[in-house]
A protein has these predicted regions:
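Short acidic loop-to-beta-strand element that houses the catalytic metal-binding Asp/Glu
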Residues: 109-118
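Conserved acidic residues
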Residues: 113, 127, 199
Length: 227
């Protein structure tokens, strides 16, 4: 509730679409209210590890804020009606099939927090999976390594044959990354190089960059690539 209340302030000031670019200040600005809520839960015995709960709230809030703004844009007609979003893509059977890569007898699946997908004639048409990270210190590398594995699985390179790598789905998902970049790691050259593996990357801050898009550009990317 404190996080959503703060987001609504930015929606009021900048509009629904541009509020995507203020998810970082939304999370930072609601920090004190979240701390008060955590103190209350610790006092009531609902949680024991305040630090772990804080990390969990930040991660889940980032996902829920994206989903909230996206659905509000769809409600207003800015997102086509046959495009959907899920914050539980691992439980979606059609998406699960689309993201499964076989390496010998084993399977490899990406780290994905959100999936945005289109449906045409009651069938899954295109899909864009997003890995969300509040910080690049987290598991961003896991996602781009899976994307690289997908490229190998769908190419004619000798590595594919050597390790018996295969991908059985006709349509490949698009793979993206979104961050609020709490610690400004995107300026690290090592992290910058990682972004080239993604079909698109987004940041929830009102900044301009030549290698990562503003999160407010997500709806246009979806319209251009999923229909």
């Amino acid at each position: 509730q404190p996080v959503l209340a703060k987001l609504k302030e930015y929606i009021e000031e900048h509009g629904l679409l541009k509020s995507f670019d203020y998810l970082h200040p939304t999370l930072v600005g609601s920090k004190d209210a979240v701390e008060d809520l955590l103190d209350f839960r610790v006092k009531n015995g609902e949680i024991r590890d305040k630090g772990q709960a804080r990390k969990s709230i930040a991660g889940s809030a980032f996902s829920l804020l994206i989903k909230y703004v996206f659905l509000k844009l769809k409600e207003s007609g800015d997102i086509p009606r046959n495009i959907f979003i899920t914050s539980n893509p691992k439980k979606h059977p059609l998406i699960e099939k689309m993201v499964t890569i076989y390496v010998g007898d084993d399977t490899q699946k990406p780290d994905m927090d959100i999936a945005i997908y289109s449906v045409i004639e009651e069938k899954l048409h295109r899909c864009f999976i997003l890995s969300l990270k509040t910080s690049l210190r987290e598991r961003a590398g896991q996602t781009y390594k899976w994307k690289l594995l997908l490229e190998i699985a769908t190419s004619d390179c000798s590595v594919r044959e050597k390790y018996n790598i295969r991908y059985d789905n006709e349509t490949m998902p698009l793979v993206g990354f979104a961050t609020v970049n709490f610690y400004d790691e995107i300026n690290n050259p090592q992290h910058r190089g990682m972004f080239q593996f993604f079909d698109s990357s987004f940041i929830g801050k009102p900044i301009k960059s030549d290698f990562i898009s503003n999160l407010s550009e997500l709806p246009e990317f979806v319209r251009a690539n999923l229909l």
